Amino acid sequence: MQSTIMLDGGKEVKLAANAATPFRFKQLFGKDLLRIFNDSSKDEEEMIGLADTVTELAFIMNSQAEGKDMSRLSMDEFYSWLEGYEPMDFIVKAQEVINVYLSSTQVTATAKKKPN
């Protein structure tokens, strides 16, 4: 799934999500993206951490959309990327970022055999 979101300042950000997204996310940030989004019992402290997760996810999906060499991503590159945005840019657009990711996880195949 590929999409473009518009940040409040009018800046467009391309995002792409695919089967590799959660693995690339874990590779760089050491967190299990599937577990984060599947855990519905979050307390207030965990919800604050989710804001960081959304920004990190936006970085991974933007890197995929831009065709970057995903094996070379680093925390320094993440911080450099962040310097191009305002502190709240991705938090304000959190639902859009999450929707791009989640739309890539939906099953789109249809059953080949009809149930009896």
What are these regions, as identified by a protein language model?
Residues 1-11, 23, 27, 31-48, ...:
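Charged interaction scaffolds used for protein-protein
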Residues 18:
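Residue-level signal for threonine
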